[in-house]
Amino acid sequence: MGVLARIQTPDDLRQLNSAEMKQLAAEIREFLVQKVAATGGHLGPNLGVVELTLALHRIFDSPADPIIFDTGHQAYVHKILTGRKDDFDSLRKQGGLSGYPCRAESDHDWVESSHASASLSYADGLAKAFELTGQDRHVVAVVGDGALTGGMCWEALNNIAAGKDRSVVIVVNDNGRSYAPTIGGLADHLAALRLQPGYERILDSGRRMVKKLPWVGRTAYSVLHGMKAGLKDAVAPQVMFTDLGIKYLGPVDGHDEAALESALRRAKAFGGPVIVHAVTRKGMGYAPAENHVADQMHSTGVIDPITGRGTGSASADWTSVFSAELIDQASHRQDIVAITAAMAGPTGLAAFGEKYPDRMFDVGIAEQHAVTSAAGLALGGLHPVVAVYSTFLNRAFDQLLMDVALLKLPVTLVLDRAGITGNDGASHNGMWDMSLLGIVPGMKVAAPRDTATLREELDEALAVDDGPTALRFPKGTVGDDVPAVSRLDGVVDILRAPSGRNDVLIVSVGAFAGLALAAAERLEQQGISATVVDPRWVLPVPESLVKLAEDYTMVVTVEDSGLHGGVGSTVSAALRAAGVDVPCRDLGVPQQFLDHASRAQIHAELGLTAQDVARQITGWFAGLGNLRPEQQNGVVADLDAQRAEKQQG
């Protein structure tokens, strides 16, 4: 029996000797590779925190001592050690193990962290609560993967430092590759110099001496200066944290479990706020991840566990289409610049940065700063494009409203992963954006349905110079283009226009065009005539769409976003404002936190399939009392089928 098979709770870890701990770390890495390869997930970050998580659970008494993982995708090892290893075959699947900490799964999961930079604020609040209620507990926050670039961390640190007697242990999981050169005698010598008061003076003296030498000396200085710059981040935390009044321990080798235990034991005994700086390597122990240049296999789909290569299709996705089009636009518009918040690869801006390095700005995990910095770029005469995941726009709403929209600045937001994203759970669904954007004065929002309209609408957004614009598109592959039959007033695309009766006008939003067309075909079989339109620009509601609605018995909107404040509600409001007395119904995502599952499974649960949409519209249409004799049989039969299904369910 292997060591991992004997681990059911953190208490079991404390019975192991040094050799068994090393064996356990190796077994956990093998387990992670095999399981994540089959389900997809965050592989690289978890391979990098194996020893760190083992040490945390050996030194601290979870769940009495909360261990809070910032950007909780690095909590897989924590889950393995807290009784959930047998559930990993269901990782990120419907009804299975969440890819993030989950309070419903275990008492060891205090929060459901997945958005970065929040762990220190949680820790600050918990420590204050324990102090006020007389509980002698330690609070641990594990923060890494760039989360310290988020301003919220520094707001929290400012407050944590004031609690001199509160035991808050902040573990900085530093897996940046800038520490790769810090090995050998030179690294040891520079580390010793850093601890001396005259470190900077000695470096300055050395710089002057070396630069006086022939050109070789200048080259040598450049190399040494580069090494210093690469290592500077190892010095800065100590200075910054100790100046705040927080004790600093480290850097510690994040893959030396014994050294980590020693540092954590000292931190625990200190009795006040402490930083433990652990230097780790993302993807540690798995060659395909260690050698993955882009991000050490930060997040993967299903892969071959031997080669690390993906097994999915290579079809074009929304992100790559946007990336190519933005590069093309920038080739003939020098005013276009791009901004991302530590998501250059996932949002498609990495290629833009390679092509136009001086026009690309990665600001770290700082969405608030990204948007207001974009405002500054716009004030300077440029047209910034801010590409973020839809769910992360929530963090920058005030900046969008007050720093961009109030000034009527031409800033374009590109919201990737809009709508239901699925496997990453409630925190990553991009279902809130329309509700937020809809209340911003002067905001214009486009929802492309395919490759052609994405390119077209990005071009149109970049032409707007009197206010903010946004494009939203979903996760995944694009699919075939959905051609329009005609375009109304140069704005609204007519995708389906049956001759004769005008029963139902279906307003499809973005990539739901295919769904709307399939539902319309089903309605036709019931004798209900359905026209399908794509407004393209969903905010503000096009006047031509409002005028078109006058001719129909009923209007139905179908969208992959929240119903409250979504496209449906804005269309209804526009119809009322124009005095158009036509019933308007909306189909979309209810305003609730949705459990993780595939996008298709969630859409099915929400009734956002062609069959369900057609049935819902059939019921509404019948309820209006407008059925003609020739429609009765088909509609009645369909309603009977719905009742039978409900009874069986």
Swiss-Prot record:
A cellular component annotation (GO) from this entry: cytosol
EC number, as in UniProt: 2.2.1.7
Pfam families in UniProt: DXP_synthase_N, Transket_pyr, Transketolase_C
Gene3D superfamilies: 3.40.50.920, 3.40.50.970
Molecular function GO terms recorded: 1-deoxy-D-xylulose-5-phosphate synthase activity; magnesium ion binding; thiamine pyrophosphate binding
Residues the record lists as binding Mg(2+): D145, N175
Cofactor note: Binds 1 Mg(2+) ion per subunit.
Keywords: Isoprene biosynthesis, Magnesium, Metal-binding, Thiamine biosynthesis, Thiamine pyrophosphate, Transferase
Disulfide topology: none
Entry's transmembrane regions: none
Classification via InterPro entries: Dxylulose-5-P_synthase (IPR005477), THDP-binding (IPR029061), Transketo_C/PFOR_II (IPR009014), Transketolase-like_Pyr-bd (IPR005475), Transketolase_BS (IPR020826), Transketolase_C (IPR033248), Transketolase_CS (IPR049557)
Cofactors, names only: Mg(2+); thiamine diphosphate
Catalysed transformations (reactions): D-glyceraldehyde 3-phosphate + pyruvate + H(+) = 1-deoxy-D-xylulose 5-phosphate + CO2
One Gene Ontology biological process: 1-deoxy-D-xylulose 5-phosphate biosynthetic process
NCBIfam families reported in the protein's UniProt record: dxs (TIGR00204), PRK05444.2-2 (NF003933)
PANTHER family named in the record: 1-D-DEOXYXYLULOSE 5-PHOSPHATE SYNTHASE-RELATED, 1-DEOXY-D-XYLULOSE-5-PHOSPHATE SYNTHASE, CHLOROPLASTIC
Biological function: Catalyzes the acyloin condensation reaction between C atoms 2 and 3 of pyruvate and glyceraldehyde 3-phosphate to yield 1-deoxy-D-xylulose-5-phosphate (DXP).
Sequence similarity: Belongs to the transketolase family. DXPS subfamily.
Quaternary structure note: Homodimer.
Protein name: 1-deoxy-D-xylulose-5-phosphate synthase
Chain's gene name: dxs
